[in-house]
Amino acid sequence: MSPSPSSSGKDGGGENAEEAQPQPQPQPQPQPQSQPPSSNKRPSNSTPPPTQLSKIKYSGGPQIVKKERRQSSSRFNLSKNRELQKLPALKDSPTQEREELFIQKLRQCCVLFDFVSDPLSDLKFKEVKRAGLNEMVEYITHSRDVVTEAIYPEAVTMFSVNLFRTLPPSSNPTGAEFDPEEDEPTLEAAWPHLQLVYEFFLRFLESPDFQPNIAKKYIDQKFVLALLDLFDSEDPRERDFLKTILHRIYGKFLGLRAYIRRQINHIFYRFIYETEHHNGIAELLEILGSIINGFALPLKEEHKMFLIRVLLPLHKVKSLSVYHPQLAYCVVQFLEKESSLTEPVIVGLLKFWPKTHSPKEVMFLNELEEILDVIEPSEFSKVMEPLFRQLAKCVSSPHFQVAERALYYWNNEYIMSLISDNAARVLPIMFPALYRNSKSHWNKTIHGLIYNALKLFMEMNQKLFDDCTQQYKAEKQKGRFRMKEREEMWQKIEELARLNPQYPMFRAPPPLPPVYSMETETPTAEDIQLLKRTVETEAVQMLKDIKKEKVLLRRKSELPQDVYTIKALEAHKRAEEFLTASQEAL
């Protein structure tokens, strides 16, 4: 197969030299009822969904303001001499002296200040450093021929001194107690300086004067490893910058690509099998989404193993909700690249299917529908039986959101076209669950959705529908016959036991009255006719009453808000937006 149009072939490793930038994109909206024509699959997004900066959601009601807490910080090695002298402005200095002045400012910005134990100390010198960083950001953005060979080691050193540090222990609980949607992130106290350092380095990488052949002496494997360690920072603003910087490095340094992928794999393995706690999984998956989008065809065995051994096991971690949109995007990208991977992916999802975690089950159903939107009919026929056995269990779930999400599959025209082509194998699997729950499910909304699904099946193949109804009736009769045989057998055993002389000594207390299910009778011919009439009327009513795009939300508790944290996250401007705005201004 030839490479896809997006694959340039510049990279010996099979990826583009420049993959699609992880530009901010709106989150995927719920699947609308009206789909493209049934012969067409839904096109996927070209960029991965961006990671949310703030995952804390409030369900309304009065706000409870929590007292602001001092934000803990990373462990910096503070400089002993922190007295900075204000240097002349770069734009006002003679051209021949600017390179030396630029280097002086870079070295001056290697001085580290205390923002935690004594935030009011050295205010004058902190302002000198902040102003110097701001000036260098503007200088490298709007000037040309300023990134000379002498600047590379100084810029990388300044970045390393300011950013590479020991991260503090997590302030939030780990394991089952950790709730990423409610536990507030710990913001970096030194952010006024760190933000400008990140902005400068990003502009440095994006500069037209930047030459990877020179920079590779300084941006090496050791640098990348230290950069990846920072992805565990609790501050989402920092992870947002790191994501963009690592993606730019991946695009510009071809020799580091395999190493970056390998180290990301190691982070994932440690997360899955050891710690189950890492703050940057969503951002790393967002980067990988763009990388996978640029893979050349046919896919290498290394990339297929990454899908099976890393991406699929990521589904079993407790904190899946934090990174699931990015993970689902990566999986779908692989299937669009190579449809033969569909069977192992769906089998893997069914293997990791949640047993007792209903919100997680809804996430799996969302992802499964995205996969079915891009599946080839030949691949669908390989997996439809185990797939619909699982869907039948979901339809029977007492958790109404799980049942509801599964039944929404019948509003997807492409999925319905696949079912129609394989109705003889799908309907016998689904009919018992649909019929049983049309009578017994506690939620009336589910009744309407079930009647809609039954109506579609009935219109699809009336004879097959009648056959399934008769088969279900026969199975119920067989079940009643087996139950009667079992009762008779126990009665015989009890009669034999009564013949024993010691029977009165060991006689059991009278049995409890039998427990009847909500559906004990075998469906009669009248029941079947009533079912058909009910399906027609209820399905029409359901289409009127139920919204086609219903967002499934997990209801959160009312927690005190940290006003400082909320304001800081709202004020943060994403790195890509910052770059786009500056480039348009040029």
UniProtKB/Swiss-Prot annotation:
Region listing for Disordered, in residue ranges: 1-80
GO molecular function, one term: protein phosphatase activator activity
Bias kind Pro residues: ranges: 23-35
Predominant place of localization: nucleus
Domain of life: Eukaryota
Residue numbers covered by motif Nuclear localization signal: 532-549
Keyword Cytoplasm: no
GO cellular component: cytosol; nucleus; protein phosphatase type 2A complex
Protein family per UniProt: Belongs to the phosphatase 2A regulatory subunit B56 family.
Protein name: Serine/threonine-protein phosphatase 2A 56 kDa regulatory subunit delta isoform
Species whose genome carries this gene: Oryctolagus cuniculus (Rabbit)
